[in-house]
Amino acid sequence: MKTSFSIQAWEEYLYFQTQDKKTLKKINELIKDIERNGALNGIGKPEKLTNNLSGLYSKRINDKDRLVYENDFIVILETVKFFL
């Protein structure tokens, strides 16, 4: 299965490479897990998104960040950061 990143996701991925190795490690684990187990199985509490995000899936990176991706072709759209 091929993995690619949107421009925004790639910029965030590069940020994590220099600023947050723990999060980067988790993102890499999630990508490998998606390749092995598919979109709705495995670690990270996989979730099928709805409404305007229909057709996309997410997995938890940590309590506040999510990895958002497509199913058949892993396209990392973004790592969503939720701020309270």
Locate the predicted segments by residue.
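Basic nucleic-acid-binding interfaces
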Residues: 2-4, 51
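A short, surface-exposed loop/turn module that caps and links secondary-structure elements
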Residues: 33-60
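Enriched for short, Lys/Arg-rich terminal
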Residues: 2, 11-24, 58-66, 70-84
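PIN-domain endoribonuclease scaffold, especially VapC-family toxins
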Residues: 24-32
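Conserved protein kinase catalytic domain
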Residues: 10-13, 31, 50
